[in-house]
Amino acid sequence: MNTADLKSFDPEVQSAIDEELGRQRHQIELIASENIVSPAVMAAQGSVMTNKYAEGYPAKRYYGGCEFVDKVEVLAIERAKQLFGCAYANVQPHSGSQANMAAFMAIAPAGSTILGMSLAHGGHLTHGAKVNFSGQIYNAVQYGLNGESERIDFDQVQALAMEHKPAIIVAGASAYSRIIDFAKFREICDAVGAKLVVDMAHFAGLVATGEHPSPFPHADIVTTTTHKTLRGPRGGMILTNDEELAKKINSKIFPGIQGGPLMHVIAAKAVAFKEALSPEFKIYTQQVRKNAVALAEVLVEGGLRIVSGGTDNHLMLVDLTSRDITGKDTEHALERAGLTCNKNAIPNDPRSPFITSGVRLGTPAATTRGFDEEAFRAVGRLIVRVVDAVAASGGAGDPAIEAEVHKEVDALCQKFPIYADI
């Protein structure tokens, strides 16, 4: 057995880890799907639980020696149920995509019709995109946003549901900044005999604390990731109140699409759920929303347009067409200035997904650092400076302005440090 520490045994990997730690410390993370986990979550994920194979479920394993991994999985399950007020939870999905696959398979066989939000309008790959399993093994029909309000077009959802009679309607998105009306989705599902699957991956942390309406009791199945606003390890989870669906979900996860669960990740999920049950986490999610509103307001003051006119959650989609610049160029310029985000298509974007006409911004990670509204207003002003420089330079950006902004980013990062003891 190799007993050397990582630095001495594999300095190349250690160097990359050190560089990534430096990046996280010295850049302001604005990618809406990312967050910063606690040392306790990292300790659980980096524990000896990684050594244990545990096919099956607690007390029903196909391997011996599962007494202690059973404890952490039961803790994760019970805490998830408490957190979201539901009867059943499966914490084994390795990702949100696998959670969605199992949820769909638990309801409808291959070839069935599903109705989900178009990727081009803010949906997720797994909601029916042609390049994804959901658009290949299912007959996927896509709804979108109202052209004027840029909110979910429920008239279109209803019309498509009546026409295609889907087995599943999917509610949820990856780039949608407004509250989702689950009751309206339920009404449409009931009218056509469809099951409602809510993918709350992006806003699960807000749901946990009442900062976003809960999908329950409207949803038949709820899927989520365990990172993003929930601030846990990267992974997935499936929730339901239906006992029969719970049994089907379990069998679709194992042995359906996965083998052994990642017990070290499940241990980290359990820790994150305990954190999310604390009063401090509610304060955190409230601040996430306040910060998003503050950031959006400053961007609008700076002449940028927010898709749908604002935000109700943790993210916003910034339309750059008025500046005649691309999301790709803007993403690169912001990163050079120490502000990390991602290019993102806007509704009906004429540019390719690799170029785009927008960027997506989110507040969860920087809020974890301690950023408040004042700090996010400062961040917003920095973003506007960089965007204006990209526009003035025909997309190239201005190295001098980026360097000036980076100094101010450094000052904010020093004011709100992370991982000081690592």
From Swiss-Prot:
Positions of (6S)-5,6,7,8-tetrahydrofolate binding: 119, 123-125, 244, 352-354
Pathway: One-carbon metabolism; tetrahydrofolate interconversion; Amino-acid biosynthesis; glycine biosynthesis; glycine from L-serine: step 1/1
Localization terms from the record: Cytoplasm
GO annotation, biological process: glycine biosynthetic process from serine; tetrahydrofolate interconversion
InterPro entries assigned: PyrdxlP-dep_Trfase (IPR015424), PyrdxlP-dep_Trfase_major (IPR015421), PyrdxlP-dep_Trfase_small (IPR015422), Ser_HO-MeTrfase (IPR001085), Ser_HO-MeTrfase-like (IPR049943), Ser_HO-MeTrfase_PLP_BS (IPR019798), SHMT-like_dom (IPR039429)
Keywords: Amino-acid biosynthesis, Cytoplasm, One-carbon metabolism, Pyridoxal phosphate, Transferase
Domain of life: Bacteria
Cofactor(s) annotated in UniProt: pyridoxal 5'-phosphate
Enzyme Commission number(s) from the entry: 2.1.2.1
Positions of modified residues (N6-(pyridoxal phosphate)lysine): 228
Keyword Magnesium tagged: no
GO CC annotation: cytosol
Site feature (Plays an important role in substrate specificity) residues: 227
PROSITE patterns assigned: SHMT
One of the record's GO molecular function terms: pyridoxal phosphate binding
Catalytic activity of the protein: (6R)-5,10-methylene-5,6,7,8-tetrahydrofolate + glycine + H2O = (6S)-5,6,7,8-tetrahydrofolate + L-serine
PANTHER family xrefs: SERINE HYDROXYMETHYLTRANSFERASE, SERINE HYDROXYMETHYLTRANSFERASE 1
Family, as annotated: Belongs to the SHMT family.
HAMAP family: SHMT (MF_00051)
Known partners and oligomeric status: Homodimer.
Protein name (Swiss-Prot/TrEMBL): Serine hydroxymethyltransferase
